[in-house]
Amino acid sequence: MPNPVIHQPEHHRFVIIEDGAQALLEYRMLAPDVIDFVHTRTPAALRGRGLAAQLVVAGVGHAREQGWRVIGSCSYVAAWLEKHAG
Protein backbone atom coordinates (compact mmCIF):
# COMPACT_ATOMS: atom_id res chain seq x y z
CA MET A 1 0.00 0.00 0.00
CA PRO A 2 1.44 3.41 -0.96
CA ASN A 3 2.35 5.79 1.81
CA PRO A 4 0.27 8.94 2.15
CA VAL A 5 1.92 11.95 0.54
CA ILE A 6 1.43 15.15 2.51
CA HIS A 7 1.57 18.50 0.73
CA GLN A 8 3.07 21.19 2.95
CA PRO A 9 2.63 24.33 0.83
CA GLU A 10 3.87 26.58 3.62
CA HIS A 11 7.24 24.78 3.30
CA HIS A 12 7.07 24.32 -0.50
CA ARG A 13 7.33 20.55 -0.32
CA PHE A 14 5.62 17.19 -0.47
CA VAL A 15 6.59 14.66 2.21
CA ILE A 16 6.15 11.04 3.18
CA ILE A 17 6.75 10.25 6.84
CA GLU A 18 7.66 6.67 7.67
CA ASP A 19 9.36 5.22 10.73
CA GLY A 20 9.96 8.75 12.03
CA ALA A 21 11.93 9.78 8.93
CA GLN A 22 10.88 12.07 6.06
CA ALA A 23 11.30 11.60 2.34
CA LEU A 24 10.63 14.87 0.56
CA LEU A 25 10.21 16.68 -2.73
CA GLU A 26 10.92 20.40 -2.57
CA TYR A 27 9.73 22.97 -5.07
CA ARG A 28 9.65 26.67 -5.82
CA MET A 29 7.13 28.65 -7.78
CA LEU A 30 8.85 30.50 -10.63
CA ALA A 31 5.59 32.20 -11.62
CA PRO A 32 1.98 31.82 -10.51
CA ASP A 33 1.59 28.98 -13.04
CA VAL A 34 5.13 27.52 -13.20
CA ILE A 35 6.45 25.07 -10.59
CA ASP A 36 10.06 23.91 -10.41
CA PHE A 37 10.80 20.71 -8.49
CA VAL A 38 14.28 21.41 -7.16
CA HIS A 39 15.21 18.58 -4.80
CA THR A 40 14.26 15.09 -3.70
CA ARG A 41 15.62 13.53 -0.54
CA THR A 42 15.11 10.02 0.75
CA PRO A 43 16.94 9.04 3.95
CA ALA A 44 19.11 5.93 3.60
CA ALA A 45 16.80 3.92 5.87
CA LEU A 46 13.87 4.56 3.50
CA ARG A 47 15.59 4.00 0.16
CA GLY A 48 14.54 1.26 -2.21
CA ARG A 49 10.83 1.58 -1.40
CA GLY A 50 9.82 3.80 -4.32
CA LEU A 51 9.10 6.80 -2.11
CA ALA A 52 10.80 9.33 -4.40
CA ALA A 53 8.63 8.16 -7.29
CA GLN A 54 5.50 8.43 -5.14
CA LEU A 55 6.44 11.99 -4.24
CA VAL A 56 7.03 12.96 -7.86
CA VAL A 57 3.74 11.39 -8.97
CA ALA A 58 1.92 13.37 -6.27
CA GLY A 59 3.75 16.63 -6.98
CA VAL A 60 3.37 16.48 -10.74
CA GLY A 61 -0.24 15.39 -10.38
CA HIS A 62 -0.96 18.37 -8.14
CA ALA A 63 0.74 20.74 -10.59
CA ARG A 64 -1.20 19.38 -13.55
CA GLU A 65 -4.49 19.63 -11.64
CA GLN A 66 -3.70 23.32 -11.17
CA GLY A 67 -2.83 23.75 -14.85
CA TRP A 68 0.78 24.65 -14.03
CA ARG A 69 3.81 24.13 -16.22
CA VAL A 70 6.27 21.71 -14.61
CA ILE A 71 10.06 22.10 -14.57
CA GLY A 72 12.40 19.52 -13.07
CA SER A 73 15.64 21.13 -11.90
CA CYS A 74 16.17 18.07 -9.71
CA SER A 75 17.88 15.38 -11.80
CA TYR A 76 15.56 12.67 -10.45
CA VAL A 77 12.47 14.67 -11.38
CA ALA A 78 13.91 15.54 -14.81
CA ALA A 79 14.55 11.85 -15.54
CA TRP A 80 11.07 10.92 -14.30
CA LEU A 81 9.46 13.58 -16.50
CA GLU A 82 11.38 12.38 -19.56
CA LYS A 83 10.44 8.76 -18.92
CA HIS A 84 6.76 9.61 -18.41
CA ALA A 85 6.40 12.29 -21.11
CA GLY A 86 3.40 12.12 -23.35
Where are these regions (language model features)?
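Short, surface-exposed charged micro-motifs
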Residues: 4, 24-27
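A conserved beta-turn-beta hairpin within the catalytic core of GNAT-like acetyltransferases
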Residues: 29-38, 69-71
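Conserved GNAT acetyl-CoA-binding A-motif
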Residues: 60-75
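Active-site rim helix/loop that mediates acceptor-substrate recognition in acyltransferases
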Residues: 1-13
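Conserved acetyl-CoA-binding loop-helix of GNAT-fold acetyltransferases
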Residues: 48-59
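Glycine-rich phosphate/pyrophosphate-binding loop shared by adenosine-nucleotide-utilizing enzymes
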Residues: 21-25, 35
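A short, internal acetyl-CoA/4′-phosphopantetheine-binding micro-motif in the GNAT/acyltransferase core
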Residues: 40-47
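Conserved beta-hairpin
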Residues: 12-22
